[in-house]
């Protein structure tokens, strides 16, 4: 019974993994993008802002940690664009 409850809770939280793992940008709260929007855009890097495509997301350069990602939300502390590290 306990295992079933744990599995149900995990399945309910699965779509909100981005809210749990990437909720800050360099110490400041960030605007959370909806999970379904991340599914549609996670493979796209915007070269106009200097994103580098690796696997299914973008990686941010350490020299310009704000505004050079695949989106305008900036980088996380680990230099990943929000919503792409664990996709």
Swiss-Prot record:
It comes from the Eukaryota. Residues 1-19 form the signal peptide. It is found in: Secreted. Disulfide bonds join 45-58, 53-70, 60-75, 69-81. The cysteine framework is XII (C-C-C-C-CC-C-C). Transmembrane segments: none annotated. Belongs to the conotoxin O1 superfamily. Keywords: Bromination, Disulfide bond, Hydroxylation, Ion channel impairing toxin, Neurotoxin, Secreted, Signal, Toxin. One of its GO terms (molecular function) is toxin activity. It comes from Californiconus californicus (California cone). Expressed by the venom duct. Residues 20-42 form a propeptide. Its main location: secreted. The modification 6'-bromotryptophan is found at residues 59, 79-80, 86. The keyword RNA-binding does not apply. GO terms for cellular component: extracellular region. The modification 4-hydroxyproline is found at residues 65, 82. This is Mu-conotoxin cal12b. Mu-conotoxins block voltage-gated sodium channels. This toxin reversibly blocks voltage-gated sodium channel in cephalopods (tested on squid giant-fiber-lobe neurons) with an inhibitor constant (Ki) of 15 nmol/l, with no alteration in the voltage dependence of sodium conductance or on the kinetics of inactivation. Has no effect on sodium channels of the two gastropod S.luhuanus and A.californica (which are not natural prey).
